[in-house]
Amino acid sequence: MYDYPCKKSDTINHKKCFDMSWSFEYKEIHTNAKKMVLMAKTHMERNEVSFCQIPFCHTVEGESLGAIIEIGNTYEPRCKYEKCKELDDVLALDDIDFTNGRIAEVILAAQLLVDENIEVIVNVSGPLTILYSLISPVKLFKGYRQSPEKVCAVFKKINDNIVEYVQVLKKSGVSKISFADPTASLPILGPERLKRHLKEVHKPLLRSLMAEFGDKGVIILCPKITYGLIGFGEGRLVEISSTMSGLISRGCVNENHKHEEGQTLIID
Protein backbone atom coordinates (compact mmCIF):
# COMPACT_ATOMS: atom_id res chain seq x y z
CA MET A 1 0.00 0.00 0.00
CA TYR A 2 1.27 3.49 -0.88
CA ASP A 3 1.85 5.81 2.09
CA TYR A 4 1.98 9.47 1.06
CA PRO A 5 5.32 10.92 2.26
CA CYS A 6 4.57 14.21 4.01
CA LYS A 7 7.45 16.64 3.56
CA LYS A 8 8.46 19.66 5.61
CA SER A 9 7.67 21.79 2.56
CA ASP A 10 4.03 20.68 2.85
CA THR A 11 3.76 22.52 6.16
CA ILE A 12 2.81 26.20 6.17
CA ASN A 13 5.23 28.29 8.25
CA HIS A 14 3.16 31.16 9.61
CA LYS A 15 5.98 32.41 11.82
CA LYS A 16 7.73 33.71 8.69
CA CYS A 17 4.71 35.93 8.03
CA PHE A 18 4.55 37.35 11.54
CA ASP A 19 5.23 41.08 11.43
CA MET A 20 7.43 42.11 14.37
CA SER A 21 5.86 45.57 14.27
CA TRP A 22 2.51 44.14 15.34
CA SER A 23 1.61 45.10 18.91
CA PHE A 24 0.90 41.57 20.11
CA GLU A 25 2.71 38.30 20.70
CA TYR A 26 2.96 35.49 18.16
CA LYS A 27 0.95 33.07 20.30
CA GLU A 28 -2.09 35.36 20.02
CA ILE A 29 -2.65 34.32 16.40
CA HIS A 30 -3.86 31.03 17.91
CA THR A 31 -6.12 32.55 20.57
CA ASN A 32 -7.69 35.74 19.17
CA ALA A 33 -10.02 35.83 16.16
CA LYS A 34 -8.99 39.26 14.83
CA LYS A 35 -5.29 38.46 15.11
CA MET A 36 -5.90 35.08 13.48
CA VAL A 37 -7.59 36.89 10.59
CA LEU A 38 -4.70 39.36 10.29
CA MET A 39 -2.17 36.52 10.11
CA ALA A 40 -4.26 34.56 7.60
CA LYS A 41 -4.67 37.59 5.32
CA THR A 42 -0.97 38.44 5.60
CA HIS A 43 -0.05 34.89 4.64
CA MET A 44 -2.50 35.00 1.71
CA GLU A 45 -1.05 38.26 0.38
CA ARG A 46 2.63 37.37 0.82
CA ASN A 47 2.22 33.96 -0.79
CA GLU A 48 -0.08 35.29 -3.53
CA VAL A 49 -2.83 32.73 -2.98
CA SER A 50 -6.56 33.40 -3.29
CA PHE A 51 -7.76 32.03 0.04
CA CYS A 52 -7.12 32.16 3.78
CA GLN A 53 -6.57 29.00 5.81
CA ILE A 54 -7.24 28.75 9.57
CA PRO A 55 -6.46 27.72 12.27
CA PHE A 56 -2.69 27.24 12.30
CA CYS A 57 -2.41 24.02 14.33
CA HIS A 58 -4.08 20.63 14.95
CA THR A 59 -4.83 21.15 18.65
CA VAL A 60 -8.01 23.26 18.68
CA GLU A 61 -10.57 20.44 18.77
CA GLY A 62 -8.62 18.43 21.34
CA GLU A 63 -8.29 21.44 23.63
CA SER A 64 -12.01 22.11 23.30
CA LEU A 65 -12.66 18.59 24.59
CA GLY A 66 -10.34 19.13 27.55
CA ALA A 67 -6.80 18.49 26.30
CA ILE A 68 -4.02 20.38 28.10
CA ILE A 69 -2.42 22.45 25.33
CA GLU A 70 0.64 24.65 25.73
CA ILE A 71 0.76 27.74 23.50
CA GLY A 72 4.06 29.58 23.25
CA ASN A 73 5.79 32.29 21.24
CA THR A 74 8.69 30.15 20.00
CA TYR A 75 6.81 26.98 19.04
CA GLU A 76 3.42 25.87 17.76
CA PRO A 77 0.65 24.75 20.17
CA ARG A 78 1.33 21.27 21.53
CA CYS A 79 -0.05 18.84 24.04
CA LYS A 80 1.54 19.34 27.46
CA TYR A 81 0.35 16.00 28.84
CA GLU A 82 -2.54 13.58 28.35
CA LYS A 83 -5.48 14.50 30.57
CA CYS A 84 -7.23 11.12 30.36
CA LYS A 85 -5.77 8.00 31.93
CA GLU A 86 -8.38 5.53 30.67
CA LEU A 87 -10.89 5.30 27.83
CA ASP A 88 -13.70 5.84 30.35
CA ASP A 89 -12.17 9.25 31.11
CA VAL A 90 -12.53 10.22 27.45
CA LEU A 91 -16.16 9.08 27.40
CA ALA A 92 -16.83 11.19 30.50
CA LEU A 93 -15.58 14.41 28.87
CA ASP A 94 -18.10 17.12 28.07
CA ASP A 95 -18.87 17.67 24.41
CA ILE A 96 -17.38 20.75 22.75
CA ASP A 97 -18.83 24.12 23.69
CA PHE A 98 -18.57 26.06 20.45
CA THR A 99 -19.24 29.38 22.19
CA ASN A 100 -16.12 29.37 24.36
CA GLY A 101 -12.36 29.00 24.06
CA ARG A 102 -10.13 28.86 21.02
CA ILE A 103 -12.65 26.98 18.89
CA ALA A 104 -15.07 29.90 19.27
CA GLU A 105 -12.29 32.23 18.10
CA VAL A 106 -11.70 30.05 15.02
CA ILE A 107 -15.41 30.12 14.19
CA LEU A 108 -15.51 33.91 14.64
CA ALA A 109 -12.38 34.34 12.50
CA ALA A 110 -13.97 32.26 9.73
CA GLN A 111 -17.12 34.36 9.93
CA LEU A 112 -15.13 37.60 9.75
CA LEU A 113 -13.35 36.39 6.60
CA VAL A 114 -16.64 35.28 5.04
CA ASP A 115 -18.12 38.71 5.81
CA GLU A 116 -15.19 40.27 3.90
CA ASN A 117 -15.93 37.97 0.94
CA ILE A 118 -12.55 36.27 1.37
CA GLU A 119 -12.36 32.58 0.53
CA VAL A 120 -11.67 30.70 3.75
CA ILE A 121 -10.66 27.09 4.27
CA VAL A 122 -10.95 25.81 7.83
CA ASN A 123 -8.54 23.07 8.88
CA VAL A 124 -10.38 20.30 10.71
CA SER A 125 -8.44 17.64 12.62
CA GLY A 126 -9.30 13.96 12.39
CA PRO A 127 -10.37 11.75 15.30
CA LEU A 128 -7.06 10.02 15.98
CA THR A 129 -5.11 13.29 16.09
CA ILE A 130 -7.69 14.70 18.51
CA LEU A 131 -7.61 11.57 20.64
CA TYR A 132 -3.81 11.56 20.90
CA SER A 133 -4.01 14.93 22.66
CA LEU A 134 -6.34 13.43 25.26
CA ILE A 135 -4.98 9.96 26.01
CA SER A 136 -1.76 8.00 25.56
CA PRO A 137 -1.56 5.97 22.33
CA VAL A 138 -0.48 3.00 24.47
CA LYS A 139 -3.82 3.09 26.32
CA LEU A 140 -5.68 3.35 23.03
CA PHE A 141 -3.82 0.42 21.46
CA LYS A 142 -4.51 -1.70 24.54
CA GLY A 143 -8.16 -0.78 24.19
CA TYR A 144 -8.21 -2.16 20.63
CA ARG A 145 -7.35 -5.57 22.09
CA GLN A 146 -9.09 -5.52 25.47
CA SER A 147 -12.19 -3.33 24.99
CA PRO A 148 -12.92 -2.88 21.26
CA GLU A 149 -16.52 -1.83 21.96
CA LYS A 150 -15.26 0.95 24.23
CA VAL A 151 -12.83 2.14 21.55
CA CYS A 152 -15.77 2.31 19.12
CA ALA A 153 -17.72 4.42 21.63
CA VAL A 154 -14.75 6.76 22.05
CA PHE A 155 -14.36 7.30 18.31
CA LYS A 156 -18.12 7.83 17.94
CA LYS A 157 -17.94 10.56 20.58
CA ILE A 158 -15.04 12.27 18.80
CA ASN A 159 -16.67 11.93 15.37
CA ASP A 160 -19.99 13.32 16.62
CA ASN A 161 -18.16 16.41 17.88
CA ILE A 162 -16.33 16.83 14.56
CA VAL A 163 -19.61 16.65 12.65
CA GLU A 164 -21.19 19.22 14.96
CA TYR A 165 -18.15 21.48 14.49
CA VAL A 166 -18.60 21.35 10.72
CA GLN A 167 -22.32 22.10 11.16
CA VAL A 168 -21.42 25.23 13.13
CA LEU A 169 -18.84 26.26 10.52
CA LYS A 170 -21.39 25.78 7.76
CA LYS A 171 -23.88 28.03 9.57
CA SER A 172 -21.11 30.64 9.77
CA GLY A 173 -20.81 30.65 5.99
CA VAL A 174 -17.86 28.27 5.56
CA SER A 175 -18.15 26.09 2.45
CA LYS A 176 -14.67 24.55 2.39
CA ILE A 177 -12.79 22.55 4.99
CA SER A 178 -9.43 20.80 4.87
CA PHE A 179 -9.57 17.46 6.69
CA ALA A 180 -6.40 15.76 7.93
CA ASP A 181 -5.52 13.15 10.54
CA PRO A 182 -1.68 13.07 10.55
CA THR A 183 -1.36 10.31 13.16
CA ALA A 184 -3.61 7.94 11.19
CA SER A 185 -0.73 6.70 9.06
CA LEU A 186 0.81 3.40 8.02
CA PRO A 187 4.05 3.81 10.03
CA ILE A 188 2.15 4.62 13.24
CA LEU A 189 -0.79 2.20 13.07
CA GLY A 190 0.52 -0.60 10.87
CA PRO A 191 -1.48 -2.09 7.97
CA GLU A 192 -4.11 -4.09 9.89
CA ARG A 193 -5.00 -1.40 12.41
CA LEU A 194 -4.95 1.33 9.74
CA LYS A 195 -7.27 -0.71 7.50
CA ARG A 196 -9.74 -1.15 10.34
CA HIS A 197 -9.47 2.49 11.38
CA LEU A 198 -10.09 3.83 7.88
CA LYS A 199 -13.07 1.54 7.32
CA GLU A 200 -14.73 1.87 10.73
CA VAL A 201 -13.81 5.45 11.73
CA HIS A 202 -12.78 7.64 8.79
CA LYS A 203 -15.14 6.29 6.16
CA PRO A 204 -18.39 6.86 8.09
CA LEU A 205 -17.11 10.23 9.31
CA LEU A 206 -16.35 11.41 5.79
CA ARG A 207 -19.78 10.27 4.64
CA SER A 208 -21.37 12.31 7.44
CA LEU A 209 -19.30 15.39 6.55
CA MET A 210 -20.21 15.06 2.88
CA ALA A 211 -23.88 14.80 3.85
CA GLU A 212 -23.57 18.04 5.81
CA PHE A 213 -22.20 19.97 2.85
CA GLY A 214 -24.24 18.26 0.15
CA ASP A 215 -23.45 19.90 -3.19
CA LYS A 216 -22.75 23.27 -1.58
CA GLY A 217 -19.25 22.69 -0.26
CA VAL A 218 -15.90 21.01 -0.60
CA ILE A 219 -13.80 18.82 1.68
CA ILE A 220 -10.11 18.96 0.80
CA LEU A 221 -8.78 15.61 1.94
CA CYS A 222 -5.32 14.75 3.25
CA PRO A 223 -3.44 12.54 0.74
CA LYS A 224 -2.55 10.05 3.50
CA ILE A 225 -6.22 9.30 4.10
CA THR A 226 -6.93 9.30 0.37
CA TYR A 227 -4.26 6.75 -0.49
CA GLY A 228 -5.14 4.68 2.57
CA LEU A 229 -8.77 4.35 1.46
CA ILE A 230 -7.71 3.56 -2.10
CA GLY A 231 -5.04 1.08 -1.00
CA PHE A 232 -7.54 -0.92 1.03
CA GLY A 233 -10.20 -0.85 -1.67
CA GLU A 234 -12.46 1.62 0.11
CA GLY A 235 -12.27 4.40 -2.50
CA ARG A 236 -11.07 5.43 -5.94
CA LEU A 237 -9.88 8.62 -7.62
CA VAL A 238 -11.49 10.27 -10.62
CA GLU A 239 -10.59 13.49 -12.40
CA ILE A 240 -12.58 16.51 -11.23
CA SER A 241 -14.40 19.11 -13.25
CA SER A 242 -14.47 22.81 -12.47
CA THR A 243 -18.04 22.55 -11.17
CA MET A 244 -17.69 19.47 -8.96
CA SER A 245 -18.31 19.55 -5.23
CA GLY A 246 -17.56 16.93 -2.60
CA LEU A 247 -14.35 15.24 -1.51
CA ILE A 248 -11.32 16.72 -3.23
CA SER A 249 -7.87 15.19 -2.98
CA ARG A 250 -4.76 16.80 -4.42
CA GLY A 251 -6.96 19.67 -5.51
CA CYS A 252 -6.56 23.41 -5.37
CA VAL A 253 -8.77 26.47 -5.47
CA ASN A 254 -8.18 29.02 -8.19
CA GLU A 255 -8.98 32.73 -8.20
CA ASN A 256 -12.50 32.02 -9.51
CA HIS A 257 -13.17 29.72 -6.55
CA LYS A 258 -13.41 26.67 -8.80
CA HIS A 259 -11.49 23.44 -8.32
CA GLU A 260 -8.84 22.47 -10.81
CA GLU A 261 -5.73 20.37 -11.31
CA GLY A 262 -6.88 17.67 -8.94
CA GLN A 263 -8.87 14.55 -8.40
CA THR A 264 -11.88 13.68 -6.33
CA LEU A 265 -12.18 10.64 -4.09
CA ILE A 266 -15.22 8.44 -4.55
CA ILE A 267 -15.88 6.39 -1.40
CA ASP A 268 -17.06 2.90 -2.32
Model-derived regions, located:
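Active-site-proximal loop/short-helix segments
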Residues: N123-G143, S172-H197
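Active-site-proximal, glycine-rich beta->alpha crossover segments in alpha/beta enzymes
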Residues: I68-Y165
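Alpha/beta enzyme core
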Residues: K156-K176, K203
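Conserved, mostly hydrophobic/aromatic
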Residues: M44, L113, I162, L169, ...
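Short beta-strand segments at enzyme active-site cores
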Residues: C52-P55, V120-N123, V174-D181, K216-C222
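Conserved acidic
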Residues: N32, K150, V154, G190
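N-terminal basic, low-complexity leaders that serve as flexible interaction/assembly modules and, when applicable
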Residues: M1-N73, E192-I220, Y227-D268
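Active-site-proximal loop/turn and secondary-structure-junction residues that shape catalytic pockets
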Residues: F56-H58, G126-L128, T183-S185, P223-Y227
